[in-house]
Design a protein with these regions (language model features):
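Flanking helices and flexible, charged tails adjoining ferredoxin-like Fe-S electron-transfer domains
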Residues: 30-67, 77, 99, 107-198
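Short, flexible loop/turn segments at beta-strand junctions in immunoglobulin-like
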Residues: 70, 99, 234-236
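Extracellular beta-sheet/turn segments enriched in Thr/Pro/Gly and aliphatic residues
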Residues: 181-183, 260-275
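Short Pro-Gly-centered beta-turn/loop motif in secreted/extracellular proteins
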Residues: 206, 229-243, 249
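Short, acidic Ser/Thr/Gly-rich low-complexity loop/linker segments typical of extracellular
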Residues: 216-231
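A short, solvent-exposed loop/turn motif at the edges and junctions
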Residues: 245-257
Length: 275
């Protein structure tokens, strides 16, 4: 039965346990015919990257995980001219370390970043194996999943109802590639529009203001309400340009735009005055 991995970026706290566990499992350990030892440095088969988003003081951090996607239509498999790459019955894509001849065609074929690495010392390509050697030994999950303290990593059978429910909430990385990956993400970063509302006459934060962003072109609307600090966050908006309207009963409406939300943006402090 095929395996899938779901990574929930919303609850990942950036502890790096998954990255460390991967190194601990593979550095200095020969798991042939699944994998030869990973080098001490230069390779991260589960690479954590801190994505700092927005502008001060409206900043969010997303901990992104780069890992082999174990695609059902993996471009690396036909690219290898010595047939060193194969897919197991459980869906894991493996580079046979004994058959690999170091031609690096798989590195060129892979459409994802920081997935396949080249080991100069061994003259072979290497990557995540879903810890297939552990699965064959009776483990139910790879080391990275076992090491995750928050439950951000979930691994299991693709037909398991609990896993299916997670996959239904998740999405693949770069879906336009249509390579049918077996790794899914919940909470992939999408743009936000943030700011703060205040009353300059009394130098106070404005709570309860309704902030509406309307996309230029298709008219799609996102709404939020300012909190006790006057802050508002319009999350997961479609990339594009927006007009932003701030309204509160008893106050003059304030409109701004176009706001470029092709990336996360802090529109700053918006002043409102009583009508």
């Amino acid at each position: 039965m095929g395996k899938v991995l779901v990574i929930d970026l919303n609850i990942c706290n950036g502890c790096y346990n998954c990255q460390v566990a991967c190194k601990d499992e593979h550095v200095g350990n020969d798991w042939s015919p699944i994998a030869k030892p990973q080098p001490d440095t230069g390779q991260f088969w589960n690479k954590v990257t801190d994505l700092e988003r927005g502008q001060v003081p409206k900043v969010k951090v997303t901990y992104m995980h780069s890992i082999c996607q174990h695609c059902d239509d993996a471009p690396c498999i036909p690219a290898c001219n010595v047939e060193a790459i194969y897919r197991r019955d459980d869906g894991a894509v493996i580079i046979d370390p004994d058959r690999c001849r170091g031609n690096q065609l798989c590195l060129e074929a892979c459409p994802y970043e920081d997935v396949i690495y080249f080991n100069d010392s061994l003259n072979i390509a290497q990557k995540c194996t879903f810890c297939a050697h552990l699965l064959d030994d009776g483990w139910t999950e790879p080391r990275c999943v076992d090491a995750c303290p928050t439950g951000a990593f979930r691994f299991g059978d693709e037909n398991d109802p609990e896993i299916m429910a997670l996959v239904a909430r998740a999405e693949p990385l770069k879906p336009q590639l249509d390579v049918k990956p077996r790794v899914f993400y919940i909470g992939l970063p999408k743009p936000f529009i943030a700011g703060a509302v205040f009353e300059p006459d009394v130098d106070e934060c404005t709570e309860g203001a309704r902030v509406t962003a309307q996309k230029v072109g298709n008219g799609k609307v996102y709404e939020a309400v300012s909190d006790s600090y006057g802050d508002f966050w319009l999350r997961d908006v479609e990339p594009g340009e927006y007009t932003v309207l701030v309204e509160k009963k008893g106050y003059l409406p304030q409109k701004m735009g176009p706001v470029d939300a092709n990336a996360d943006i802090n529109v700053g402090d918006i002043a409102v005055w009583k009508a």
